C-alpha cells in the first residue's frame, strides 16, 4: 500500500515529461515511455490490491487507510486536506483503471503509428489516467471535485485531439460546455454540504456521526426560524 503515491504521481510525471519534450522525442520512444509507465503502475496496483485484501481485517471488515495533510484551513472545524483514501472500492478501481489504461496504451502504439500528434496523444492519455486515479483515491469531496474537473479537461483534450478538423473541435467544445453545467451544480452542492456539516471529509460524512447531521439540521431550523421572524416584522 506504500506504492499508492507512486501509482498516483507517475502518470503525472509522464504527462509532464512527454508534454514538455513533445516533438524532441521520437514517436515510438514517447509511446514506449507512456506504455512502460502504465505497465509499472498497473503492476504496483496489483501488488497494492494483493497486500490490501490479504491484510488482517478489523472486526471482520477491511481497514480504511487514510493518508492526508492539511492544505487549506477556513476555520477550526472546516479545512481542506490533500491525501489518499484506500478502501475496498478504491483499491479495486486502481486495478481497473490502470489495467484498462494499459490496454489502451498498448493498442494505441500500433493504432496511432504514423500520426503527427503521437507524442501529444500519449501525454494526454497519461493526464487522463492521473485524473481518474486521483478521483478514486480522494479523501474528501472537494479533492474529488478537483480531479473530476481534470477528467473533464483530459476528455476535452482527447476528444479534440485532431484540432485541425472542425468536427473534432465542435465535439470537444460541446462536451466541455455541457459537462460544465453539471459541474456547476456539483460545486454548489459541495459548498452547501460543507456549509452545514462543516467538513469535506468522506470518512466523517459517511461515518454515521449523528452530530454532523444534527448540526446541519439545527442550522437549517435556525435559518428558517430567523427568516419567519424577519418576515413577520
Task: Enumerate the predicted regions with their spans.
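...captures the hydrophobic TM-helix bundle architecture rather than a specific catalytic motif
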Residues: 1-231
Amino acid at each position: 500500500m506504500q506504492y499508492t503515491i507512486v501509482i498516483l504521481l507517475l502518470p503525472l510525471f509522464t504527462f509532464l515529461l512527454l508534454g514538455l519534450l513533445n516533438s524532441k522525442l521520437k514517436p515510438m520512444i514517447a509511446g514506449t515511455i507512456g506504455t512502460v509507465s502504465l505497465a509499472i503502475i498497473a503492476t504496483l496496483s496489483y501488488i497494492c490490491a494483493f497486500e490490501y485484501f490479504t491484510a488482517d481485517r478489523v472486526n471482520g471488515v477491511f481497514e480504511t487507510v487514510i493518508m492526508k495533510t492539511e492544505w487549506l484551513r477556513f476555520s477550526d472545524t472546516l479545512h481542506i486536506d490533500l491525501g489518499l483514501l484506500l478502501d475496498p472500492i478504491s483499491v479495486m478501481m486502481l486495478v481497473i483503471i490502470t489495467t484498462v489504461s494499459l490496454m489502451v496504451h498498448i493498442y494505441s502504439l500500433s493504432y496511432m503509428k504514423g500520426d503527427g500528434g503521437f507524442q501529444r496523444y500519449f501525454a494526454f492519455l497519461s493526464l487522463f489516467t492521473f485524473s481518474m486515479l486521483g478521483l478514486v483515491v480522494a479523501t474528501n469531496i472537494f479533492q474529488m471535485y478537483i480531479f473530476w474537473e481534470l477528467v473533464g479537461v483530459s476528455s476535452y483534450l482527447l476528444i479534440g485531439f485532431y484540432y485541425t478538423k472542425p468536427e473534432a473541435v465542435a465535439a470537444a467544445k460541446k462536451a466541455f460546455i455541457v459537462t460544465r453545467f453539471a459541474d456547476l451544480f456539483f460545486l454548489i452542492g459541495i459548498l452547501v454540504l460543507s456549509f452545514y456539516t462543516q467538513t469535506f471529509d468522506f470518512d466523517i460524512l459517511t461515518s454515521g456521526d449523528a452530530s454532523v447531521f444534527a448540526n446541519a439540521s439545527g442550522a437549517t431550523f435556525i435559518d428558517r426560524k430567523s427568516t419567519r421572524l424577519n418576515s413577520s416584522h
